[in-house]
Regions:
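Extended, compositionally biased repeat/scaffold regions that form elongated interaction surfaces
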Residues: 21-278
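N-terminal, polar/Ser/Thr-rich
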Residues: 277-301
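Ligand-binding face of N-terminal immunoglobulin V-set domains in extracellular IgSF glycoproteins
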Residues: 299-326
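Zn2+-dependent metallopeptidase catalytic core
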Residues: 304-311, 361, 421, 428-444, ...
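A surface-exposed beta-strand-loop module
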Residues: 327-392
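Juxtacatalytic substrate-recognition/specificity segment
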Residues: 371, 432, 479-585, 589-598, ...
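Extended, low-hydrophobicity, Ser/Thr/Pro/Gly-biased non-transmembrane segments
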Residues: 373-478
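Acidic/His/Gly-enriched intrinsically disordered linker/tail segments
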Residues: 599, 603-672, 688, 705, ...
Length: 720
């Protein structure tokens, strides 16, 4: 999405006062934490961390959240819960409608228990098994240090006897002989879990945490053990004990106030859970028959089917489809929902996610067939969707209910956000038919290959393979590029089509002139464009409106009619925005990413390769263009932050995700050199084509191709 173009790039080419590109790079040492996604989480963090500022102890959570997500959990009101990850743990809100003043409104997950057992809790009575975490529980060097997985051994996980008053024993075998440096007595036997407390940890629990110890730590799930590890570059003996929610360490070499510390459980858990998304390949296929009513309302009726295979590994009783048009009152009306021949129970989760539940669970490996009938009353055009009555253009972006991904044992869905893009989906196959309810001849452009059209021009058919969603623009006034070759371009095997009003014909031809060379350059430098066609279309929006922006979709790019009056003078943002949108066909359309939690992976990359296109092909325009693209860069959040990470507004979001993200990529390229950098991009594109990448996916490929140490750059912009 090119919201940054409207908000950031329309400013002067000079950096903002006091915020030049050079000063940012020189003064920023480490990326700041993410913002707080809920005031109650912030209040809990502030309360718990008061002792840090006074020097009484070290962090209980960490300097701030580093990741925000909505994770699936059966039985909750919305079907999932808001979580924020910190270095030392995770805070979560299970019932946003509950008593925010309750000490249990914000809770801490049983992260250690899950890492030891290898089972992610995705419901009160349901877990998803991904295998115990083979991550060292403490220290900077994993050699000789037990992992969470090793605590699953029967000799460690089984209940022990009451050893109060005894010397600490270790249950890992000879290589973990208890060192005298951390030899402390056992002072309490926990009847609930069947394990003994080491003296330093019980004193910390009752003296520092007081009546909060159970809420923060949980019960001990293993006996305390002494290990030798590397901390701060030095070999040290520390005492370690695992609890349901936390890991505690005791280091006698530290000052007394910091001898007992929390382990980095939040980081360990996040890396374990999200190292592999465990996304089920559902082989989803969509079919939609869309009937467009007459002007001036353009009421639209849709019959849609969704078919997929239950590859989740267990019986499936529900499905969740993100339904963006439900966001606006009176726009989306569901008439019927059938699952495998049975009328489904419906529920709206976070307002826009349609949950369909059946009384007959679908066995693993079986087919699921969903049939929907719904009506749309298009709103006045705004942003990426709606009806422009003055130009008679109907924008149908994000209009089909779309199956959300199944990841880590549950459906992955989120609330609506005004920031960024509206959802993320697995690559699927679509067959879409669009027609008028009468005999009106429509012209339709959008996602899919080159459309087929009935002789009378009233019915358009699109087939799209391996796309993440679909979008269309409809008008009886469009020039039909299938009948007017001047509204097409050929780039290798790719046919480019332009859908514009007659009075904007030259603008449509200019858009093709701008985008065709970019299509060729990206194909050569990054990897081949994988589809047979690409569509550029105007999507209405009266000329006096300013709350609009260009929008990418698979195999398509829509530009507001209101932008056309601005021209496309070389070097201006209206000149390179079309290139930015073409770049999204590589980053978003082909290589997918969660645009709600990892938006920089498509927006920063699209911004940066656009700049690289200008640098390579228009070197005289590059300095001013690059300055304009990055002049809003800010360090208020990490580049890898998501839309729920506490951004104050769209300006701040764009300045971080687009501008700072592009700056980081530029520093990485300079450190690696052009040859290695582009080899990494080609590797990334080839590896994740048709799949979904993560921040760690891209960073791992950069590290693999780089001879230079990239860590200082990444720490500065991302934080790790």
């Amino acid at each position: 999405m090119s919201i940054l173009v409207v908000i950031i790039l329309a400013q002067t080419a000079e950096p903002r006062a006091g915020m030049s590109v050079a000063s940012i790079a020189a003064t920023q040492v480490q990326a700041p934490p993410e913002g707080f996604a809920h005031s109650a989480i912030k209040a809990r963090w502030e309360k718990d961390e008061r002792g840090v500022t006074s020097g009484q102890r070290t962090w209980m959570w960490g300097p701030g959240p580093f990741r925000t997500a909505y994770e699936p959990f059966d039985g909750l009101l919305q079907g999932n819960h808001l979580v924020q990850y910190f270095d030392k743990g995770r805070l979560e809100i299970n019932d946003p409608s509950g008593d925010a003043q309750s000490s249990w409104f914000v809770t801490s997950g049983l992260l250690v228990n899950e890492m030891v057992t290898g089972k992610i809790q995705v419901g009160s009575n349901r877990t998803f098994h991904i295998g115990p975490a083979r991550v060292s529980v403490v220290g900077d060097d994993p050699r000789g240090v037990p992992t969470y997985a090793e605590f699953l051994l029967p000799t460690r996980s089984e209940r022990t006897v009451d050893l109060t008053g005894k010397t600490i024993g270790c249950w890992f075998g000879e290589r973990f002989v208890q060192p005298k440096e951390v030899d402390r007595p056992l002072v309490r036997y926990e009847q609930v879990s069947g394990h003994n407390w080491a003296e330093p940890f019980w004193n910390f629990a009752t003296g520092t945490l007081k009546d909060q110890w159970l809420q923060i730590l949980g019960y001990p799930i293993a006996e305390p053990c002494g290990v030798k590890t590397i901390i701060g570059g030095k070999s040290q003996y520390v005492l370690v004990q695992l609890f349901e929610r936390r890991v505690l360490t005791y280091n006698p070499a530290n000052p007394s106030a910091t001898q007992v510390e929390m382990g980095n459980v939040g980081r360990h858990y996040y890396n374990w859970r999200y190292a592999d998304m465990h996304e089920a390949d559902l082989d989803t296929k969509y079919n939609a028959q869309i009937q467009i009513g007459p002007a001036p309302r353009r009421t639209t009726t849709v019959q849609q089917t969704v078919q997929f295979t239950n590859t989740t590994g267990s019986n499936l009783s529900n499905a969740v489809l993100r339904t963006v048009w439900k966001r606006w009152d009176g726009v989306f009306t569901l008439k019927s929902a059938i699952v495998n021949g049975e009328a489904a129970r419906t529920r709206w989760l976070h307002g826009i996610n349609l949950e369909l539940t059946t009384s007959k669970p679908v066995p693993a490996g079986a087919q699921v067939s969903i049939a929907l009938i719904f009506e749309l009353q298009p709103r006045p055009v705004g942003g990426r969707t709606g009806y422009d009555k003055s130009n008679d253009i109907l924008g149908l972006g994000d209009m089909l209910p779309t199956l959300v991904p199944w990841e880590n044992g549950g459906w992955s869905f989120y609330p609506y956000s005004d920031l960024g893009d509206l959802g993320y989906y697995a690559a699927s196959d679509y067959s879409v038919e669009i027609a008028s309810t009468g005999s009106e001849k429509l012209v339709v452009g959008g996602t899919g290959g080159i459309p087929t059209v009935d002789v009378n021009g009233a019915r358009w058919r699109f087939n799209a393979t391996g796309v993440r969603d679909v979008a269309y623009v409809v008008s009886p006034r469009f020039i039909n590029p299938l009948a007017d070759a001047s509204m097409t371009r050929q780039v290798g095997s790719v046919k480019m089509l332009a859908y514009f009003l007659p009075e904007h014909k030259s603008d449509g031809q200019r858009q093709l002139q701008l985008t065709a060379p970019a299509m060729a350059w990206f194909s050569n430098e990054i990897g081949p464009y994988p589809f047979e066609s690409y569509t550029v279309a105007e999507m209405g929006v009266p000329l006096e409106r300013t709350d609009n922006y260009a929008q990418e979709y698979p195999t398509a790019y829509f530009i507001p009619s209101s932008w056309l009056r601005l021209g496309t003078a070389p070097g201006t943002w209206t000149w390179y925005t079309p290139v930015h949108e073409v770049a999204h066909q590589w980053f978003y359309s082909t290589v997918g990413n969660n645009q709600l939690t990892d938006p920089w992976l498509d927006e920063a990359l699209a911004t940066y390769v656009t700049a690289e296109y200008v640098r390579a092909n228009f070197p005289d325009l590059y300095p001013a263009s690059w300055s304009s693209m990055t002049n809003g860069a800010t360090n208020v959040r990490p580049v890898s932050a998501g839309v729920f990470s506490g951004f104050a507004n769209e300006n701040q979001y764009s300045a971080t995700i687009y501008d700072s993200g592009a700056l980081m990529l530029d520093r990485i390229r300079r450190a690696m050199g052009d040859t290695s950098f582009y080899a990494a991009l080609r590797d990334y594109y080839k590896t994740y084509q048709g799949k979904r990448a993560t921040t760690d996916s891209l960073l791992a490929i950069f590290h693999r191709h780089s001879k230079a140490d990239l860590k200082p750059i990444i720490v500065q912009y991302i934080g790790y």
